[in-house]
Amino acid sequence: MKYIILAAISALLFSVSWPTYGVPFFIFFAFVPLLLMEQEISKFSKIKRKGWAVFGLSYFTFFIWNLVTTGWLKYKKNPDGSNSLLAVAIPLFANSLLMSSTFQLYYWYKKVRGTYFGLVFFVAIWLSFERFHLSWEFTWPWLNLGNVFSEYPKVIQWYDTI
C-alpha cells in the first residue's frame, strides 16, 4: 500500500507543478517519492517480481500525471461533432508507457551498477528520452520537465539579468 501512496504522491507533485496549476517549485521534488518507491521495492520488499512492480507503479505515476496535465484533449472533436476518445487514449497510454520504460531502464541499470551510477544514469537517460521525444515522428513535447517554467521566464533566463 505504501508503494501506491508514494507513486500517487509523485504523480500529484508532477501534476501540481505543471503550468496549468502554477506551482513549478514542486517539480524539483516530484521524482523523490518515485525513487523512494523504487529503492524500497528493490532493497526491502518481499515482492517476487520486483521489476514488474517498479514498472507498474511508475506506469501508474506517469499515467496519472499524463491524465491530469493532458486531460484537455478530451475536448477534441471528431468530424461528426462527437468527442474523440482516441485523442486522449493514444497519447495517454503511449506516453505513460515511454516514460515508465525509461524509468525501468534506470531500475535495471541501478540493479547492476549500484545506486550512485544508477542515479547518474537516470539523469542521463531521462534527458535523452526528452531529447528523443522532441525529434521523432510522434513528438509529444508537452510533458518535458522544463515546461513547468513556461509561465516564469525570469526563472530560466536569469543570466539575462546579469
Q: Each predicted region: which residue ranges?
A:
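Membrane-embedded alpha-helical bundles of multi-pass enzymes
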Residues: 1-162
